[in-house]
Amino acid sequence: MKNPFIELYGCMCLTLLTLAPQPAAAKTVGEVPPADTLRTVFFTDIHVTPGNVQDSLFRIAVAEANASDADLVIFGGDLTNMGSDRELAHVHGLMSQLRKPWFTVPGNHETTWSESGCTAFRRLFGHAGCVATRAKGYLFLGYASGPYMKMADGMIRGEDLAWLERQAAAARPGERIVSLCHYPLNGDLTNRQEVTETLKSVGVTASLYGHYHQLQLRNFDGIAGIPGRALAGKRGEAPGYTLLDFFADSVRIREKPLGMPPVTRYTVCLKDDPQILALPCDPLPPAPDAEGRMRLVVQDSAMVLTGAAFCGEVLCYGNSQGALRAYDTRKGRELWRHVFPDGLYTTPLCTGGLVIAGAASGGIWAFDARTGREKWHLPTQSAVVGDGITDGGALYIGLGTGSIGKIDLRSGRLLWRHDYGCGQAQGRPALADGRLVFGAWDRHLYCLDAGTGELLWKWNNGSGSLFFSPGHVVPRIAGGKVFIVAPDRVVTCLDLATGKQLWRDNSRKSRETTGLSGDGRRFYYKTMDGELAAIDTSAERYRELWCTDLGWGYEYNSCPAFVRDGVVYVAGRHGTVAA
């Protein structure tokens, strides 16, 4: 069905001026007059893909914003669907047609599936997630909420909280500080309490948010949650956006349907509004109870986004500030570090006295495990965000979007490269019987000849949605079969030799967390209801051996299960571990 708003405005020819994004940091401090009336357009969850309905709707919205009396345009994230380089460049071009000052933060759709490891956003918008903007006596502090390169709850990086404190300390006298975060500051953030306490300590009383696609006031531990609606709206709802009018001590929230007059939905005091304080807050998560069962090895000032690898007593991992660290757990000190320009997402590999890591800034690197001296470096054309596997003196790993390769561990020489088209191969590949099996964010699971890189077969689940791709799965191989659980919430079994689909089962809602017993007889997977199930790998059809409720409730964090000495270890989205 044709959208009447698209048909009405489709023939409009817009000649619009380009305006670059606002700088990522506030400027010099000084006296400012008391906060004045500030009229803003608040766009969030616009979800633009070239050629989709939102693409047309957003062009109309930009024209309306340009014709309005708004002083400032604010974007609350989820500008795209998959966060691809193509989508980001396209939506940035549309945003640049605004003739008003504007700034944006990323949403989870820019950070969870980013093929560039979140580097394209920084390149286009001038910051990696933190942005400060001043307007008429207001200081807006925007920051990213993740999750980063995997399905998980949101989290504000420690370095971003430190940035918030520095920016707030530099606020001009009389300036009112407003927070902007794509995620609501509630139970959907793993460190929500730390975030709200930080904001309150620097005088923030209101936070703009999106993510939920609807206009609903919220109480973020005493901070007023000011919502923005999605551009497309719910089924049967007119497309539109949000207008926020700040009046020094209050904000008026208006809904603006495309082509129609705005409608006032709420008026909220910016401090201690009774209607906000009367709303319930999400309960705080229980305090950790691992006393006596857990030992802190190292506390990092940045967010750890990789898995851990051990070279004997040396722990190796990467963080969100691009530091690859080697930490001696016995002596309790750092041995060495190498800092890359962007965050690290690949779990390091320790083998043959080498530490190997891929970089979101591009390239695969090998370092001497003892000294940190670079041994070799293989350039790539795009970000490396996937995990690798070693076997027989070779490394198998994604070489950026659309390709995977085999690398000689000693020299760093590329032995073969297979180009499959597009999408990152993010999950760790599996190797058996001379066959390399991996998934990609292009809807397909691939099987290659490990010796030559020749394609033997590929499979997809029949869905046209990239969101259901097996891009972050770790295939498990046992008895000549391949077992996977992808975001389509189905357990799938394929024949390793031919790629023939043997069976699929959706009796339980499953996600990417899987494991395999040491003898290969049991395949483990975590359900979205917080259960751990085991199935018989030798059975001709799905045969469940047992299912244990972990007591976690709703669960979707993708973290491979770890099996050792007959015990399965599995982690949850709230930082809990079960065995």
Regions found by a protein language model. Give the residues of each.
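Extracytoplasmic beta-rich repeat domains
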Residues: P288-A309, W336-L349, W376-D391, G400, ...
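Extended active-site neighborhood of metal-dependent phosphoesterases/phosphodiesterases
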Residues: D85-P173, E194-A206, Q216-G228, K234-F247
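N-terminal active-site segment of His-dependent metallophosphoesterases
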Residues: F5, P23-A89
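Binuclear metal-dependent phosphoesterase catalytic core
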Residues: T133, I223-P286
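Short loop/turn segments that connect beta-strands within beta-propeller blades
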Residues: D328-G332, D368-G372, D408-G412, D449-G453, ...
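Structural signature of WD-repeat beta-propellers
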Residues: N319-S320, A359-A360, L399-G400, A440-W441, ...
